[in-house]
A protein has these predicted regions:
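N-terminal auxiliary interaction/assembly segments of multi-subunit proteins
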Residues: 1-174
Length: 174
Protein backbone atom coordinates (compact mmCIF):
# COMPACT_ATOMS: atom_id res chain seq x y z
CA UNK A 1 0.00 0.00 0.00
CA UNK A 2 1.60 3.32 -1.00
CA UNK A 3 2.12 5.96 1.65
CA UNK A 4 -0.40 8.73 1.20
CA UNK A 5 0.13 11.10 4.12
CA UNK A 6 3.47 12.64 5.09
CA UNK A 7 4.39 11.82 8.68
CA UNK A 8 4.75 15.25 10.26
CA UNK A 9 5.47 16.23 13.83
CA UNK A 10 1.86 17.35 14.25
CA UNK A 11 0.61 13.97 13.02
CA UNK A 12 2.93 12.13 15.43
CA UNK A 13 1.74 14.37 18.27
CA UNK A 14 -1.90 13.70 17.32
CA UNK A 15 -1.38 9.91 17.21
CA UNK A 16 0.50 9.68 20.52
CA UNK A 17 -1.87 12.07 22.30
CA UNK A 18 -4.88 10.06 21.15
CA UNK A 19 -3.21 6.76 22.11
CA UNK A 20 -2.12 7.90 25.59
CA UNK A 21 -5.48 9.53 26.28
CA UNK A 22 -7.53 6.54 25.11
CA UNK A 23 -5.50 3.94 27.04
CA UNK A 24 -5.20 5.90 30.28
CA UNK A 25 -8.87 6.91 30.25
CA UNK A 26 -10.08 3.38 29.45
CA UNK A 27 -7.68 1.31 31.56
CA UNK A 28 -6.96 3.66 34.47
CA UNK A 29 -10.01 5.95 34.56
CA UNK A 30 -7.58 8.88 34.37
CA UNK A 31 -7.41 11.61 31.73
CA UNK A 32 -3.86 12.72 30.92
CA UNK A 33 -3.24 16.31 29.87
CA UNK A 34 -0.81 17.02 27.04
CA UNK A 35 2.06 19.38 27.87
CA UNK A 36 4.25 21.12 25.31
CA UNK A 37 6.71 18.69 23.70
CA UNK A 38 10.42 18.95 24.31
CA UNK A 39 11.63 19.12 20.70
CA UNK A 40 14.85 17.17 20.40
CA UNK A 41 14.82 16.47 16.66
CA UNK A 42 17.50 14.13 15.32
CA UNK A 43 20.17 14.93 17.92
CA UNK A 44 22.44 12.03 18.74
CA UNK A 45 23.20 13.59 22.11
CA UNK A 46 21.70 11.75 25.05
CA UNK A 47 19.15 14.06 26.63
CA UNK A 48 16.97 13.75 29.66
CA UNK A 49 13.26 13.48 29.07
CA UNK A 50 12.61 15.56 32.18
CA UNK A 51 11.77 12.78 34.61
CA UNK A 52 14.02 14.12 37.38
CA UNK A 53 16.09 11.83 39.58
CA UNK A 54 13.30 9.56 40.72
CA UNK A 55 13.15 5.81 40.08
CA UNK A 56 11.55 5.15 36.69
CA UNK A 57 9.75 2.26 35.05
CA UNK A 58 10.01 2.61 31.29
CA UNK A 59 8.00 0.43 28.94
CA UNK A 60 9.14 0.14 25.35
CA UNK A 61 7.50 -1.34 22.26
CA UNK A 62 8.83 -1.13 18.73
CA UNK A 63 7.07 -1.02 15.39
CA UNK A 64 8.41 -2.29 12.08
CA UNK A 65 7.13 -1.98 8.53
CA UNK A 66 6.89 1.03 6.21
CA UNK A 67 8.22 3.05 9.12
CA UNK A 68 10.31 1.70 11.99
CA UNK A 69 10.75 2.93 15.50
CA UNK A 70 10.41 2.60 19.23
CA UNK A 71 8.19 4.26 21.79
CA UNK A 72 9.47 4.55 25.34
CA UNK A 73 6.78 5.30 27.91
CA UNK A 74 8.37 6.75 31.08
CA UNK A 75 6.50 6.57 34.40
CA UNK A 76 7.92 7.30 37.81
CA UNK A 77 7.85 4.27 40.10
CA UNK A 78 5.10 5.70 42.33
CA UNK A 79 2.80 6.17 39.33
CA UNK A 80 3.73 2.78 37.89
CA UNK A 81 2.69 1.23 41.22
CA UNK A 82 -0.57 3.22 41.23
CA UNK A 83 -1.34 2.11 37.67
CA UNK A 84 -0.59 -1.52 38.49
CA UNK A 85 -2.84 -1.50 41.56
CA UNK A 86 -5.68 0.03 39.53
CA UNK A 87 -5.28 -2.33 36.57
CA UNK A 88 -5.13 -5.46 38.71
CA UNK A 89 -7.42 -4.42 41.56
CA UNK A 90 -4.61 -4.85 44.09
CA UNK A 91 -3.80 -2.99 47.27
CA UNK A 92 -0.32 -1.54 47.89
CA UNK A 93 0.31 -4.36 50.40
CA UNK A 94 -0.67 -7.00 47.84
CA UNK A 95 1.58 -5.35 45.28
CA UNK A 96 4.51 -5.33 47.72
CA UNK A 97 3.98 -9.04 48.25
CA UNK A 98 3.66 -9.77 44.52
CA UNK A 99 6.90 -7.97 43.63
CA UNK A 100 8.37 -5.94 40.80
CA UNK A 101 7.54 -8.44 38.04
CA UNK A 102 3.84 -7.62 38.42
CA UNK A 103 4.62 -3.92 37.92
CA UNK A 104 6.78 -4.74 34.90
CA UNK A 105 3.98 -6.82 33.36
CA UNK A 106 1.34 -4.14 33.94
CA UNK A 107 3.47 -1.31 32.53
CA UNK A 108 4.48 -3.53 29.62
CA UNK A 109 0.82 -4.07 28.82
CA UNK A 110 -0.05 -0.35 29.17
CA UNK A 111 2.83 0.44 26.83
CA UNK A 112 1.75 -2.24 24.37
CA UNK A 113 -1.79 -0.82 24.24
CA UNK A 114 -0.51 2.74 23.89
CA UNK A 115 1.94 1.93 21.10
CA UNK A 116 -0.78 -0.17 19.45
CA UNK A 117 -2.97 2.92 19.27
CA UNK A 118 -0.06 4.96 17.90
CA UNK A 119 0.67 2.24 15.31
CA UNK A 120 -2.97 2.22 14.20
CA UNK A 121 -2.64 5.91 13.34
CA UNK A 122 0.43 5.13 11.23
CA UNK A 123 -1.35 2.24 9.49
CA UNK A 124 -4.44 4.36 8.80
CA UNK A 125 -2.16 6.97 7.19
CA UNK A 126 -0.68 4.46 4.75
CA UNK A 127 2.30 3.19 6.75
CA UNK A 128 1.54 -0.43 7.64
CA UNK A 129 3.64 -1.77 10.48
CA UNK A 130 3.61 -4.41 13.22
CA UNK A 131 4.48 -4.24 16.91
CA UNK A 132 7.37 -5.91 18.68
CA UNK A 133 7.02 -7.44 22.12
CA UNK A 134 7.17 -5.05 25.08
CA UNK A 135 10.21 -4.75 27.30
CA UNK A 136 10.88 -2.86 30.51
CA UNK A 137 13.75 -0.67 31.66
CA UNK A 138 14.13 0.38 35.28
CA UNK A 139 16.48 2.91 36.75
CA UNK A 140 17.18 6.40 37.96
CA UNK A 141 18.75 9.28 36.05
CA UNK A 142 19.33 7.54 32.72
CA UNK A 143 18.91 8.67 29.16
CA UNK A 144 18.29 6.95 25.86
CA UNK A 145 20.51 7.73 22.87
CA UNK A 146 18.86 7.45 19.46
CA UNK A 147 20.77 6.14 16.47
CA UNK A 148 21.91 8.89 14.12
CA UNK A 149 19.30 8.18 11.45
CA UNK A 150 16.35 8.29 13.85
CA UNK A 151 14.14 11.31 14.40
CA UNK A 152 13.21 11.81 18.04
CA UNK A 153 10.01 13.31 19.42
CA UNK A 154 9.39 13.67 23.16
CA UNK A 155 5.91 14.42 24.51
CA UNK A 156 4.91 15.11 28.09
CA UNK A 157 1.57 14.33 29.71
CA UNK A 158 0.37 15.09 33.22
CA UNK A 159 -1.82 12.44 34.78
CA UNK A 160 -2.97 12.08 38.40
CA UNK A 161 -0.28 14.56 39.50
CA UNK A 162 2.44 12.52 37.79
CA UNK A 163 4.41 13.08 34.59
CA UNK A 164 4.19 10.52 31.77
CA UNK A 165 6.71 10.93 28.97
CA UNK A 166 6.38 9.38 25.52
CA UNK A 167 9.80 9.28 23.86
CA UNK A 168 9.39 8.31 20.18
CA UNK A 169 12.25 7.34 17.87
CA UNK A 170 11.35 6.87 14.20
CA UNK A 171 12.96 6.30 10.83
CA UNK A 172 11.56 5.29 7.44
CA UNK A 173 12.16 1.70 6.37
CA UNK A 174 15.00 1.16 3.95
Amino acid sequence: MPSTVEITESLIREFITRAVTDVFRTMLSRVPTFSAPADIGGDKVAKSVGTENRPQVVGTVGFIGEVNGLVYLHLDLAFARMCTCHLLGMTEAELDEAGDEVINDAIGELTNMTVGGFKNGLCDSGYPCMLTIPSILRGTNFSIEPISSAVRHVYHFDCAEHRVVADILMKPSE
